[in-house]
């Protein structure tokens, strides 16, 4: 684990592919894209979706991550925006995205959306499910409290 919580958060987030994006009180499953050196998360969506409408208005949104395998649980607050950055689209384009858009990256229904995180409440654990069970068992036979990782609020702006 990195000594810097922001670095550790980004490293773990990069290895996770999905989360739940809250738009107008409704949670939508989405695949995010993390680009090294870029503080934003990137999404590809269709133009007539709740996410597209929210991005067109520069709306605030929450993105929730829950990954036992990577030991990251996060509630991220941020702002959505529509982007016309073709180089960014080229960088994040993948086979999953191509499954949704018949005409590929030039599909008229495709919309690139950036998500600029502001603050994230995070919980980071080590050892996955086995680590959790070990900590609980250890607490039962000792006077120690279980060490279930770190809980922090990160300013990502």
Predicted regions span which residues?
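N-terminal leader/targeting segments and the immediate start of mature chains
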Residues: 1-18, 153, 157
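A short, Trp-centered hydrophobic/proline-enriched beta-strand micro-motif
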Residues: 9-27, 61-65
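Conserved beta-strand in the GNAT
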Residues: 29-32
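Short, low-complexity Ser/Thr-rich regulatory SLiMs
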Residues: 34-36, 124
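Short active-site oxyanion
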Residues: 37-42
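Short hydrophobic/aromatic beta-strand micro-patches
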Residues: 44-46
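Short, structured beta-strand-loop surface elements
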Residues: 51-119
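C-terminal edge-of-domain segments
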Residues: 108-157
